[in-house]
C-alpha cells in the first residue's frame, strides 16, 4: 500500500464543477478544494436557498458562488469535494454522473439512531463515482461497505514562497483536536530544556478539546493562533514553514493512516522534516522512519528528537521524492 512513486495519472479533459457541501472552514477538506482550484482553475460552488450573482470569499484568494439546488443541477460534471451531515439531504437529488471524494473513515461513521445515508439505508455512495485519497480509506470503504472507489493522491499546487521566514525550529500546523494529539506535543514541550527547540503551535482549535485536554499543559503559551488562509502559510505576514527544521504531526485516525495529508505535503514542499506518529506510519509503506521522516509515539521520544542535533540533508532529499505524484496527478 501507498507505493505511489510509480503512480500513473489517468488523463482527464473534462472541466469539473466543484461543490463544497460542508460546514468546516479549516482543515483538509478546505485545503483539498483549494489545491484543486488553484491547480486546475475549476470553479467552486456552494448550495444555498437562492442563487447569488455575486461571489463570496472562500479563502486562499479563491471565491465561490452560492446556487440554489435547481441551478446547481444545471452545471456539468458535478464534483463534490467534501460532504458532511448538514448536506446529506442534497445528495439524492444529484445525477448519477456526480463524482464525490471521501477523505477519511470519520465520514463513514454508522449509527443505529441516526443512520449515515452515505453507507447505511440508501447507501448514497453507490449512486456516484467515488474517489478516496488514501489507500487505507479505499480499503476500509470496500471491506466494510462493499463500495468500490478509485484511489487518487492529493493534488498539490506549487505556490510561491516569497515572504520573510517566521524563524523557529519546530511547528505543528494541523487542527488542534483529539485526533491530532496536540496534548502529546505539549507534554514533549514540557520535557525540552531549550526553549528554542520547543514546538510552536498553529491552527484552528477545537475548544472542547482545549478545555478538557490542554488546560494544564500551558497551551496558550505555545499556541500562536490560526494562520492566515493563504499560501504560503503565514503568521504576522511571516512564512511559518520557511527555514523551519521540523513539522510535527501526531495525527492518528482510526482505520486510516499511512498516506499523506496536506500538512505533510506543505512541510515537504518547503523543505521541512516531518515528525509523524509511529502508528500513522505503520498503516502503510510510503513513510519510512529514519529515511524520509522521523517518528515518535510518546512525549519522551518526541522531546528527544527535538532536542538532539542531527544532519537532516538526507531526510529532506528522500522526502522530496514523495511530492512528485501529487504535482503530476490529474483530477
Residue ranges and their predicted role:
Residues 20-35, 178-180, 255-257:
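A short, glycine/small-residue-rich beta-strand->loop->alpha-helix junction that serves as a flexible
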Residues 3-7, 51-142:
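Extended catalytic core of nucleotide-activated donor transferases of GT-like folds
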Residues 269, 273-277:
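Short hydrophobic beta-strand element within catalytic cores of glycosyltransferases
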Residues 159, 166-235:
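Conserved catalytic-core segment of nucleotide-activated headgroup transferases in glycan assembly
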Residues 297-331:
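A charged, aromatic-enriched C-terminal amphipathic alpha-helix characteristic of glycosyltransferases
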Residues 105-106, 136-137, 150-162, 176, ...:
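Short beta-strand->alpha-helix junction loop in the catalytic core
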Residues 110-113, 143, 148-169:
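Acidic anion/phosphate-binding donor-loop and adjacent secondary structure
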Residues 180, 248-265, 277-285:
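Nucleotide-sugar-dependent
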Amino acid at each position: 500500500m501507498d507505493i505511489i512513486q510509480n503512480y500513473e495519472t489517468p488523463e482527464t479533459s473534462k472541466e469539473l464543477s466543484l461543490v463544497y457541501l460542508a460546514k468546516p472552514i479549516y482543515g483538509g477538506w478546505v485545503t483539498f478544494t483549494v489545491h484543486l482550484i488553484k491547480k486546475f482553475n475549476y470553479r467552486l460552488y456552494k448550495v444555498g436557498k437562492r442563487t447569488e450573482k455575486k461571489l463570496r470569499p472562500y479563502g486562499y484568494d479563491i471565491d465561490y458562488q452560492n446556487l440554489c439546488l435547481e441551478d446547481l443541477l444545471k452545471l456539468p460534471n458535478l464534483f463534490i469535494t467534501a460532504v458532511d451531515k448538514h448536506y446529506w439531504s442534497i445528495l439524492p437529488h444529484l445525477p448519477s454522473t456526480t463524482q464525490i471524494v471521501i477523505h477519511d473513515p470519520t465520514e463513514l461513521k454508522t449509527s443505529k439512531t441516526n443512520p449515515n445515508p452515505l453507507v447505511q439505508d440508501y447507501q448514497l455512495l453507490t449512486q456516484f463515482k467515488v474517489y478516496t485519497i488514501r489507500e487505507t480509506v479505499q480499503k476500509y470503504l470496500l471491506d466494510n461497505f462493499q463500495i468500490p472507489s478509485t484511489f487518487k493522491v492529493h493534488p498539490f499546487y506549487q505556490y510561491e514562497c516569497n515572504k520573510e521566514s517566521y524563524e523557529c525550529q519546530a511547528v505543528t500546523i494541523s487542527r488542534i483536536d483529539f485526533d491530532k494529539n496536540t496534548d502529546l506535543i505539549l507534554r514533549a514541550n514540557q520535557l525540552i530544556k531549550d526553549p528554542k527547540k520547543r514546538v510552536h503551535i498553529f491552527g484552528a482549535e477545537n475548544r472542547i478539546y482545549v478545555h478538557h485536554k490542554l488546560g494544564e499543559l500551558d497551551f496558550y503559551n505555545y499556541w500562536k493562533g490560526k494562520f492566515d488562509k493563504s499560501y504560503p502559510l503565514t503568521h504576522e505576514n511571516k512564512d511559518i514553514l520557511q527555514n523551519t527544521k521540523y513539522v510535527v504531526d501526531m495525527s492518528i485516525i482510526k482505520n486510516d493512516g499511512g498516506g499523506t495529508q496536506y500538512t505533510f505535503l506543505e512541510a515537504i514542499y518547503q523543505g521541512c522534516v516531518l515528525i509523524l506518529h509511529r502508528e500513522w506510519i505503520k498503516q502503510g509503506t510510503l513513510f519510512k522512519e529514519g529515511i524520509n521522516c522521523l517518528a515518535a509515539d510518546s512525549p519522551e521520544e518526541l522531546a528527544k528528537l527535538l532536542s538532539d542535533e542531527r544532519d537532516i540533508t538526507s531526510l529532506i532529499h528522500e522526502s522530496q521524492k514523495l511530492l512528485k505524484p501529487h504535482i503530476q496527478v490529474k483530477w
